[in-house]
Structure formats: structure tokens, C-alpha cells
């Protein structure tokens, strides 16, 4: 297999600096050599936008500048997740102020913080559940699916993000469970190979190439990510509430979304 051909970008981060030092760029390019000369070089931070804002790098040194994202830095309830998704467009819109013409990536995007960058011993950071601090039992529920759809919506609406990477592929931080099953069947009761609801979000986006700006009159109850592939338009409609919600998108017929469900609606293509 052509592993080199599958690599889009090398990201270079520091174990000791919160933002990639500018002088690392030429050193990284030299280390990668001619073999990877056609692969983009990314810098920035694998922490949060705050770090990028405090210590902005020289955008001209890198092909891509990165920051990571999680909705649960300070609070962990579902309402916080909903509100966090809606604020992501503000963060994304501010990124070009620092990166100028350099493309922006958001990676990794995780439901829980991967570690606490401000802890004395980040690897020993203790969560507020029986699970490891970087694992959320809601990864296997509608909450992760809804939040992911809305995160994609609000990041895309800013029009400034070139790349975004969500979760892991397999396991309790992924979009499906591993063949071996859960590492903690009591606190994360999934089955081997189970596809989590968030799988359906990415399946619904397969082949889509553009996201549309859309506003909900009650985004903490129901919201929609609208996408198209140039010929077909689709809406991923999420119902955050535990009651059925009737929604209407533009002049299309109304639809009732069951409690806590996500429904994918095919829409007449307008443009």
C-alpha cells in the first residue's frame, strides 16, 4: 500500500511548548526530506484556540495551522454541549485573524478533553465519572451524534476551516465499538462492533461537498445541518429534547422528529 500517498499533512507539535515554535518548520522540512516534500506541514497547537491566540505563530512558516476542540473544558452537562456547538462558528471566524491566508485545521475534535494541559501531571488527570477522564459514556448515544452534526454545521458556517478531524475510528472514543468490545462493560455498555449513532452522521454526509448557512428558531430544542453535493440537498435534523418536535425547513413540508432522534431529510435542490 502507498502509505506516503495517503498522508495529506504532517503536524509538528512540541512536548514542552503549547504552540509549535516557528523555527521548527524548517527543521521539520529538513527532517522529512525530499520524500515528503509534496506533503503539507502543519503547526499551531494540539491544545485549544486560546493557546493559539496567546502565542500566535508566524503563519508563513506553515502550510496549515491547527487547534483542537472539545465541548467540555469547564462543564459537562448536555446543555453545555448544545451551547458549545453554537459558539464554534465564532471561534472559527476569528481564526483567520491569526492565521491570515494559511489554511486552518481543527484536530482532534473529541467529546471529552484528551488531557488537562494545565494540570501538574496531565496524564494522571482524574475525570468526574468511573470512566477514564478522556472517555464519555455519551459517545455511544444520541448526544455525541447530535453534537457532532451541530459542530460540523457551525464550524462550516464560518467558512474559514479547511480541515476537521473528529474522534477516533474504533473504540469508546470512536464512531463504532471495536470487535473486542468495551473495556468497561458496566460503565460503557456497548456491544462488540456496535455502530454508535454518530456513525449515522458521517454516513449521512458521505458524498456531500457543501454546507449551507441555516438558523433554527429554537436551536437548544431542534437544529439542522443542511448539505448538498451539487445536485442533491439533504438536512440532518436533530431533536435535542425528550418530546417530539415539528420542524419546517424553508418552504418544504413540515416533519415531526421523534424525541432525541436525528432524521435525515432529502430536500428539493434549490441552488
Features from the language model and the residues they span:
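Short, acidic/polar
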Residues: 1-2, 49-57, 144-154
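Noncatalytic carbohydrate-binding groove/subsite architecture in carbohydrate-active enzymes
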Residues: 8-12, 16-142
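Aromatic/acidic polysaccharide-binding cleft in carbohydrate-active enzymes
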Residues: 105-198
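C-terminal beta-strand-rich structural cap/linker in extracellular carbohydrate-active enzymes
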Residues: 255-271
Amino acid at each position: 500500500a502507498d502509505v506516503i500517498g495517503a498522508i495529506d499533512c504532517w503536524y509538528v507539535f512540541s512536548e514542552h511548548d503549547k504552540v509549535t515554535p516557528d523555527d521548527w518548520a524548517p527543521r521539520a522540512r529538513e527532517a522529512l526530506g525530499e520524500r515528503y516534500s509534496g506533503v503539507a506541514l502543519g503547526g499551531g497547537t494540539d491544545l485549544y484556540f486560546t493557546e493559539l491566540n496567546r502565542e500566535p505563530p508566524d503563519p508563513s512558516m506553515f502550510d496549515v495551522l491547527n487547534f483542537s476542540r472539545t465541548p467540555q473544558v469547564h462543564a459537562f452537562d448536555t446543555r453545555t454541549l448544545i451551547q458549545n456547538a453554537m459558539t464554534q462558528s465564532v471561534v472559527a471566524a476569528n481564526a483567520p485573524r491569526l492565521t491570515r491566508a494559511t489554511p486552518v485545521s481543527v484536530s482532534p475534535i473529541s467529546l471529552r478533553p484528551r488531557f488537562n494541559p494545565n494540570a501538574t501531571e496531565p496524564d494522571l488527570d482524574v475525570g468526574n465519572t468511573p470512566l477514564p477522564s478522556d472517555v464519555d459514556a455519551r459517545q455511544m448515544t444520541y448526544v455525541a451524534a447530535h453534537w457532532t452534526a451541530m459542530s460540523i454545521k457551525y464550524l462550516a458556517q464560518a467558512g474559514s476551516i479547511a480541515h476537521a478531524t473528529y474522534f477516533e475510528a474504533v473504540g469508546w472514543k470512536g464512531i463504532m465499538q471495536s470487535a473486542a468490545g468495551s473495556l468497561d462493560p458496566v460503565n460503557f455498555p456497548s456491544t462488540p462492533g456496535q455502530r454508535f449513532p454518530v456513525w449515522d452522521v458521517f454516513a449521512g454526509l458521505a458524498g456531500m461537498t457543501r454546507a449551507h448557512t441555516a438558523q433554527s428558531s429554537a436551536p437548544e430544542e431542534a437544529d439542522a445541518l443542511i448539505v448538498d453535493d451539487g445536485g442533491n440537498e439533504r438536512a440532518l435534523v436533530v431533536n435535542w429534547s425528550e418530546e417530539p418536535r415539528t420542524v419546517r425547513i424553508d418552504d418544504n413540508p413540515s416533519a415531526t422528529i421523534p424525541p432525541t432522534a436525528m432524521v435525515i431529510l432529502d430536500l428539493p435542490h434549490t441552488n
